């Protein structure tokens, strides 16, 4: 059973086909039928404006569920996010995302949370009950540790919207104009190397050289990863 406003309900009646009306709903109902071992099902759509009903019997299409499972597997294991089907000005982006969420979604800023799931060393486990694994320390990671992250964190390069100059097991070097920025763990920092927390703050100002100088002063005086909230404060 689905509900729809009058406009969408009229579109369904004109299409005369539930699966032609919505490709998302079509995939959904096919997966439901396959999972429940049904060969056909009755779908009912309720008009929220005038209580009208649309009914249709839908037959199963073999292979849809397996195809969607394979697609889900590819997405889960991907090292880069799928290409967005929406432009940065699409109403779904503007209406349903905060300014911060839009900036992260459009790769203009790094996410606020530095954690295992956005670290290059981690990967999902899809066997058994699932989970996450750290390849740096060669062990599974429970949820609490995933959320906390660690000082060996290196951003997934797909989240850093800069050209890659070079990368190693424990660092990635990016270019911003003539300047290089190496994302490295806390114990491997140099004058052009930055922790993931520092990279996050620098991304808010598009890696402004003046803010980089300020960061270096803070680091020299107070230590790594201290007073970062002051870097971009206006």
PLM features: what roles do these ranges have?
Residues 12-13, 17-24, 31, 35-233:
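Metal-dependent nuclease catalytic regions and adjoining charged, substrate-binding loops involved
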């Amino acid at each position: 059973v689905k509900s729809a406003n009058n406009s969408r309900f009229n579109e369904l009646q004109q299409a005369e086909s539930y699966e032609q009306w919505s490709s998302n709903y079509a995939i959904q109902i096919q997966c439901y039928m396959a999972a429940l071992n049904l060969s056909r099902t009755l779908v009912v759509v309720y008009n929220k404006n005038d209580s009208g009903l649309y009914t249709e019997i839908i037959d199963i299409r073999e292979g849809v569920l397996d195809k969607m499972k394979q697609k889900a597997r590819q997405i889960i294991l991907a090292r880069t996010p799928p290409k967005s089907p929406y432009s940065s000005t699409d109403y779904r982006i503007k209406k349903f995302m905060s300014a911060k969420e839009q900036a992260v979604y459009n790769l203009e800023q790094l996410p606020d949370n530095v954690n295992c799931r956005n670290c290059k060393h981690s990967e999902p486990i899809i066997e058994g009950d699932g989970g996450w694994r750290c390849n740096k320390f060669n062990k599974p990671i429970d949820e609490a540790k995933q959320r906390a992250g660690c000082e060996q964190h290196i951003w997934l390069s797909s989240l850093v919207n800069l050209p890659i100059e070079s990368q190693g097991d424990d660092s990635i070097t990016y270019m911003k104009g003539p300047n290089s920025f190496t994302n490295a763990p806390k114990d491997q920092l140099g004058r052009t190397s930055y922790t993931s927390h520092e990279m996050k703050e620098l991304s808010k100002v598009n890696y402004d050289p003046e803010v980089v100088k300020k960061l270096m002063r803070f680091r020299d005086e107070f230590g790594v990863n201290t007073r970062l909230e002051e870097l971009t404060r206006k």
